[in-house]
Amino acid sequence: MTDSIPKKPFKKGSLVFVDRENYIKSIEALASDDDLPNYVFEGPGEILSVKDEYAQVRWRRPVPDVWLKLDQLKEYTQ
């Protein structure tokens, strides 16, 4: 069999930012504030936990951690 278990693209400690285009098209965006702060799109945020298709992200600011879908996140590179 050539089927393999897909690896999670991100793990605890990964640095990420939110992909604006994927976020805006998501159902989560409809349930949230339209005006997200720029730092979520610029990054980096650190993944604290991954569960199913969601990741808990902590930003380097005094704000609460958030859960975002993995397909809305991209790897942060300097």
Curated annotation (Swiss-Prot):
Gene Ontology cellular-component annotations: plasma membrane-derived thylakoid membrane
GO MF, one annotated term: oxidoreductase activity, acting on NAD(P)H, quinone or similar compound as acceptor
Membrane topology: Peripheral membrane protein
Leading EC class: translocase
Keyword annotations from UniProtKB, A to Z: Membrane, NAD, NADP, Plastoquinone, Quinone, Thylakoid, Translocase, Transport
Matches recorded under InterPro entries: NdhO
Main subcellular localisation: membrane
Coiled coil location: none
Location in the cell: Cellular thylakoid membrane
UniProt family annotation: Belongs to the complex I NdhO subunit family.
Function: NDH-1 shuttles electrons from an unknown electron donor, via FMN and iron-sulfur (Fe-S) centers, to quinones in the respiratory and/or the photosynthetic chain. The immediate electron acceptor for the enzyme in this species is believed to be plastoquinone. Couples the redox reaction to proton translocation, and thus conserves the redox energy in a proton gradient. Cyanobacterial NDH-1 also plays a role in inorganic carbon-concentration.
Subunit structure: NDH-1 can be composed of about 15 different subunits; different subcomplexes with different compositions have been identified which probably have different functions.
Protein name: NAD(P)H-quinone oxidoreductase subunit O
Organism: Prochlorococcus marinus (strain MIT 9215)
Gene behind this protein: ndhO
